[in-house]
Amino acid sequence: MSIPQIRTEAIEAVGRKILMEYDPSLLSGQPCPVPIETIIETKFDLILEFHTLRKNPKILGETIFDDGAVVLYDQIQRQYRMIAVRAGTILIDERLCDPSKLGRLRFTCAHELAHWVLHKKLYSGTGDVAAYNGNVSSDESHGIIERQADTLASALLMPLPQIKKCFYRIRIGRTDEQLIAEMANI
């Protein structure tokens, strides 16, 4: 698998372009939470589903590039089962829906969207899925792919123009932690 080398600045530009096309006020208006789930489902026409992905919650999300089947854990039956999935499906571990994990949920959604945007050509036709476990991989090529997805996820959820606005507000003496919490939707 040939890993595309993408500069951080280019990935951040992709994030700004996505937000600009979806709603320019996310870059220039009042800082607010980026509606990542809505962007996934409306701008990209992807399917967002919530399931228990594994018995051990190490895998937080998966992006499906080809029609096929995936293995999920059934907590009621206490066994793994297969379900059919379509290309363009993002699977998120439903345990992230706990209110205390909202930040991780939003980041995982953005991370999986980033795989779709940045790595679709890399994975399509291979039968592989991009899976996120929240850790840096020891496999160098996998680590590069995950860092790229992390970078785009960050650019989407924390657009630089809005971060700068918040920084300057705080810098001039306003230490409003609530503003930061509201912007991050946590």
Task: Tell what function each PLM region has.
Residues 1-186:
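Active-site hotspot residues in diverse enzymes, especially metal/ion-binding acidic/histidine motifs
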